[in-house]
Amino acid sequence: MNINSTLFLQAVVFAILVWFTMKFVWPPITKALDERAQKIADGLAAADKAKSELSSANKRVEAELATSRTETATRLADADRRGQGIIEDAKARAVEEANKIIAAAQAEAAQQSVKAREALREQVALLAVKGAEQILRKEVNAGVHADLLSRLKTEL
């Protein structure tokens, strides 16, 4: 064979190989490469989407935490106010009860004082009558001199 015919035959075989490769080998390879590229692109898109969703979820969580903190602070302040109100009410009731007890004790003391004064007047009147009886050396009749004794009580 001649170089020219060999070269020509090699060129024909090469062309057939190129055609066969382009027709039967290359499309599945490009299809597999395209599918792989699509999977990678989908994975990257899913990763970006997940990243944005994570960022959004973190923002929502932070917002919820802030809301929860403010709500908790509000509830604590409200509970503190209620506690102070209850304490103030209890103090006011205690002061009111103490004032009632003091007023009752003062009234009872005044009543006891009046009773004691009356008892002292009675005793002083009896002592005065006994003293007068001893001075006069005669008996003073309490029934007869009741008017005199009552005036003596009022004067004392």
Curated annotation (Swiss-Prot):
Keywords: ATP synthesis, Cell inner membrane, Cell membrane, CF(0), Hydrogen ion transport, Ion transport, Membrane, Transmembrane, Transmembrane helix, Transport. The keyword Secreted does not apply. Coiled coil: none annotated. It is found in: Cell inner membrane. It holds the Pfam family ATP-synt_B. CDD domains: ATP-synt_Fo_b. F(1)F(0) ATP synthase produces ATP from ADP in the presence of a proton or sodium gradient. F-type ATPases consist of two structural domains, F(1) containing the extramembraneous catalytic core and F(0) containing the membrane proton channel, linked together by a central stalk and a peripheral stalk. During catalysis, ATP synthesis in the catalytic domain of F(1) is coupled via a rotary mechanism of the central stalk subunits to proton translocation. Component of the F(0) channel, it forms part of the peripheral stalk, linking F(1) to F(0). Belongs to the ATPase B chain family. PANTHER family: ATP SYNTHASE SUBUNIT B (PTHR33445:SF1), ATP SYNTHASE SUBUNIT B', CHLOROPLASTIC (PTHR33445). F-type ATPases have 2 components, F(1) - the catalytic core - and F(0) - the membrane proton channel. F(1) has five subunits: alpha(3), beta(3), gamma(1), delta(1), epsilon(1). F(0) has three main subunits: a(1), b(2) and c(10-14). The alpha and beta chains form an alternating ring which encloses part of the gamma chain. F(1) is attached to F(0) by a central stalk formed by the gamma and epsilon chains, while a peripheral stalk is formed by the delta and b chains. This is ATP synthase subunit b. The gene is atpF.
